[in-house]
Structure formats: structure tokens, C-alpha cells
């Protein structure tokens, strides 16, 4: 008889010490993660925890591709559309919410299944060591920096209002090592670091040393025992699928959702507006609304409800119509950015293996995506995934960590690389830099850069001779 979860209160004393078992399903967008998680309920008593950063927010159900109530098939789903759209929900927030939730699910003798493509969310739960903990724990001990508003006040009182507006440059002067770790536009993190220094006299980089930095992202001493599954498919097949999915989203009401959330001059770095498919329509909506309100489009009513209903009609305007061109370009940008996203997600999964030593089981959904056959889905996806999980539940040894890897590439958390050939693109850490150098775009630009430099050098030499 299979033991579902060794952490249940009814298990014998020695088994109570064993870690609870958690299934993780990750992978690129469009690969079928949510569908697999729901179908596993036919084989195991599962509860699903959403690990998609945008699906956590309420709203934009079509655009973020949330599983519908019908698609959930009665399987319990958690953290799906539960966070206010304007809130910032960090990896630490996700971890702090999810860990107790996993324990709660285990107490019901059910199997928690963590599902999503936001791999830094998953990493925050799977790894016991979250790199930002040291800094944030220090903040919590200091009443002067208890909120974002207070952080601004602390930084302003010490460095002045003018310096506050140039926070990244100030941080580079104070602690260049810490500045290298974050993006120049990450104002929340910049203020966090500056407030630490202002209130405690501590260099942020000093906090990221020792055990936390050494074990960051690894599964050493993890809270639970993890079965790590990655849904995958050929990139070209996923490209075609996500493009078709965007078209289907437009038919299903994507434009209505974007219209509802549109706000001129909105902050696209926080909350639900970070979603792919929001910012891409900003220019189109700005022109569309201004012309409609000015009465230039007599064929469309100014009534809010009717305007939303007529958005898709713009796609039937003459091909040379400015609004139709802008709308089609916006839809194409959504497709492009979605294709880019799935490539980033694939790279991140690979990094979890090569850099952090995760033992990941891959399930190839290519045949199903091409055929749309439920027979193929069951044979190529559900059956192998169920066998992997069944073996995981029956084994006594931990499954998530691969002891033979994880140190294959030295992790460099603090070094920033700048690629001049690619327009001064910033890469953080040796792994990102090495991966970037192998890319086709970088190689092409490097070749052009070298040829251009050779030509310039030849011109200089000829000028000196003459």
C-alpha cells in the first residue's frame, strides 16, 4: 500500500520525522503544466498551488490564461486570483504564504502540487536559503525602516532629496558590490539597500556572505522532499502554439480586459500591469481613446460598454487604417514577448539543474501539442508523470537534489558583466555571461564589431602612413 505523505499525524513516530512530499510542475508557458496538474487528481489526492506570478493577482483572467472553474474539474486550487492587482507580491511573500499552506495540505493527507512558470517563486519555496532574507531580516529588527514610505524618509534624511532621485548612482559609490547585483531601475531594492546603510551603517553586500550566499538556490537542508517535473516541448512547436493562443485570447475577450485595466501613465513595474499583454496595447489605446473622445470615429459609440464591444471590430477596418495597423502591431508584440518569455523559462530550468543541482524529470508534450489528441496526452504526458510521482511517493530517499551536480558552474552572485557589442547589455553572474556569449545574436554582433574595428584600425594605419 502506498504511503501518501509521511508527515500526517497518523503515521508512526519514526516516520513523522520524514519530510513531507511535494510535487513541483514547472516549465515554459504553453507546455501544459496546469492541465497535467489537474489530470493528476485522477491518480492521486492532490491540491494545486499556483506558482505563476501574474495568475496570483485578481483580474485579467483571459490574458494571464488562468484555469477556468470548468478546467479545474473540482480540484482545489490555491493562490489563484487572490492578490489585489496593485499589490507587489515578492518571492519572499510567496514563500511565506506557501510553506504554511503546504503544511496545511499535508495535514489533510493530500499531496501539494506546486504549478507554474515563475521559477524564482518555486526556487524560493524549494530552497531553504533565500538570498534576500539576511537584508530583510535586518530591516525587520529596525523600526525606522518598517515601510517603503519610512525607507524613503530615512534615505532622504541622511542623503538628501537630490541624492534620493539618483539612488542607484549613490549606491554604486557606497557599495559597488551590492549595486552590481541589482538592476538600476529596481527602485524598491535600491531604497532597501540605502535605508539599511542609512539606519544601521551596514553595507548590504556584507549581509550576503557565508552560509546564505553559499547555499542560495540549492536544495540542501530543504523543508520538504520534492519531485521536480518539467513540462517541455520543442521551441518551434511552442512558438506556433502560443501565437495561436494569443489569437484565441483576443477572441475570448483579451481586449476588453486590457481596456478595463488601461490607465494613462500607469506604473508597469508593479502588480498585475507587469503582465505580458498590458503595456503592449498602451499606444493603441491612447490613440483610440483620444480620437474617439474627439469624435473622429463616428462609427464607434463613446459608451464605455459599446467601446469595449467594438474594439475587435477595428481588426475588420481597411488594412491601411491607422488604428487597425496599431492594434495588429500590439497583438504581434504580445506574441513576440510571449515567445521570448518561454525561451527565458527554458533557460531558467536549465540553470536550476546545472547551477543549483536540481534533479528534474522532463516530460515532452511536443506530440500532444501537434496532434491535440487526448490519447497522445495520456500516453506521452499523464502516464509517465504519474509513474514518476508514484515512484517518488514510494521511495525513502530524497529526490529533489542531484548530488552529482550543482557545482558544475561556479556561482558568482556579485560580478556584473557589460557586453559592449550588444549595446552595453548588463549580465549578472558568470553563468548569465557564459550563456549570453553562446547566443547567436551575440556572436553575430561580436563578428560585426570585430570587422568594424579592423576596418577602423586599417583606416588609422593608412592615415598615419600618408
From Swiss-Prot:
Residues 456-466 have a biased composition (Basic and acidic residues). The record marks 118 as: Interaction with substrate tRNA. It is found in: Cytoplasm. Residues 52-55 are annotated as: Interaction with substrate tRNA. Substrate binds at residues 29-34. Residues 437-451 have a biased composition (Basic residues). GO terms for cellular component: cytosol. Its EC number is 2.5.1.75. Expressed ubiquitously, with highest expression in proliferating tissues. Keywords: ATP-binding, Cytokinin biosynthesis, Cytoplasm, Magnesium, Nucleotide-binding, Transferase, tRNA processing. It catalyses: adenosine(37) in tRNA + dimethylallyl diphosphate = N(6)-dimethylallyladenosine(37) in tRNA + diphosphate. GO terms for molecular function: AMP dimethylallyltransferase activity; ATP binding; tRNA dimethylallyltransferase activity. Its main location: cytoplasm. Its cofactor is Mg(2+). Disruption phenotype: No visible phenotype, due the redundancy with IPT9. Contains 2 inserted regions when compared with other members of the Arabidopsis IPT family. No adenylate isopentenyltransferase activity detected neither in cv. Columbia, nor in cv. Wassilewskija. This is tRNA dimethylallyltransferase 2. It comes from Arabidopsis thaliana.
Amino acid at each position: 500500500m502506498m504511503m501518501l505523505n509521511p508527515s500526517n499525524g497518523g503515521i508512526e513516530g519514526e516516520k513523522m520525522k520524514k519530510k513531507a512530499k511535494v510535487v513541483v510542475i514547472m516549465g515554459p508557458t504553453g507546455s501544459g503544466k496546469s492541465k497535467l496538474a489537474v489530470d493528476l487528481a485522477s491518480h492521486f489526492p492532490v491540491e494545486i498551488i499556483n506558482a505563476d506570478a501574474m495568475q496570483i493577482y485578481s483580474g485579467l483572467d483571459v490574458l494571464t490564461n488562468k484555469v477556468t472553474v470548468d478546467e479545474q474539474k473540482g480540484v482545489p486550487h490555491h493562490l489563484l486570483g487572490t492578490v489585489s492587482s496593485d499589490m507587489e507580491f515578492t518571492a519572499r511573500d510567496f514563500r511565506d504564504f506557501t510553506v504554511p499552506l503546504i503544511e496545511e495540505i499535508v495535514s489533510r493527507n493530500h499531496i501539494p502540487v506546486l504549478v507554474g512558470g515563475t521559477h524564482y517563486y518555486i526556487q524560493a519555496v524549494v530552497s531553504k536559503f533565500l538570498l534576500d532574507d539576511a537584508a530583510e531580516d535586518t530591516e525587520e529588527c529596525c523600526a525606522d525602516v518598517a515601510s517603503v514610505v519610512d525607507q524613503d524618509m530615512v534615505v532622504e534624511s541622511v542623503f538628501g532629496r537630490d541624492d534620493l532621485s539618483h539612488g542607484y548612482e549613490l549606491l554604486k559609490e557606497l557599495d559597488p558590490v551590492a549595486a552590481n547585483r541589482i538592476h538600476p531601475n529596481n527602485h524598491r531594492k535600491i531604497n532597501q539597500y540605502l535605508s539599511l546603510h542609512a539606519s544601521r551603517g551596514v553595507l548590504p553586500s556584507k549581509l550576503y556572505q557565508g552560509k546564505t550566499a553559499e547555499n542560495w538556490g540549492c536544495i540542501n537542508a530543504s523543508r520538504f522532499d520534492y519531485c521536480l517535473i518539467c513540462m517541455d516541448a520543442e521551441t518551434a512547436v511552442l512558438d506556433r502554439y502560443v501565437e495561436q493562443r494569443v489569437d484565441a485570447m483576443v477572441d475570448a475577450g483579451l481586449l476588453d480586459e486590457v481596456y478595463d485595466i488601461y490607465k494613462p501613465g500607469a506604473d508597469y513595474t508593479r502588480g498585475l500591469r507587469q503582465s505580458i499583454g498590458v503595456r503592449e496595447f498602451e499606444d493603441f489605446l491612447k490613440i483610440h481613446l483620444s480620437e474617439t473622445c474627439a469624435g473622429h470615429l463616428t462609427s464607434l459609440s463613446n459608451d464605455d460598454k459599446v467601446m469595449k464591444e467594438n474594439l475587435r471590430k477595428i481588426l475588420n477596418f481597411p488594412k491601411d487604417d491607422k488604428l487597425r495597423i496599431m492594434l495588429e502591431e500590439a497583438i504581434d508584440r504580445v506574441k513576440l514577448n510571449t515567445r521570448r518569455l518561454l525561451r527565458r523559462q527554458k533557460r531558467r530550468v536549465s540553470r536550476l539543474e546545472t547551477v543549483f543541482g536540481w534533479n528534474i524529470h522532463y516530460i515532452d508534450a511536443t506530440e500532444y501539442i501537434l496532434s491535440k489528441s487526448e490519447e497522445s496526452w495520456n500516453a506521452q504526458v499523464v502516464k509517465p508523470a504519474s509513474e514518476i510521482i508514484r515512484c517518488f511517493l514510494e521511495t525513502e530517499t530524497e529526490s529533489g537534489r542531484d548530488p552529482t551536480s550543482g557545482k558544475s558552474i561556479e556561482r558568482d552572485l556579485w560580478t556584473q558583466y557589460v557586453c559592449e557589442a550588444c549595446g552595453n547589455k548588463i549580465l549578472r553572474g558568470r553563468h548569465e555571461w557564459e550563456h549570453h556569449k553562446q547566443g547567436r545574436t551575440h556572436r553575430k554582433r561580436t563578428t560585426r564589431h570585430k570587422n568594424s574595428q579592423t576596418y577602423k584600425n586599417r583606416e588609422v594605419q593608412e592615415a598615419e602612413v600618408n
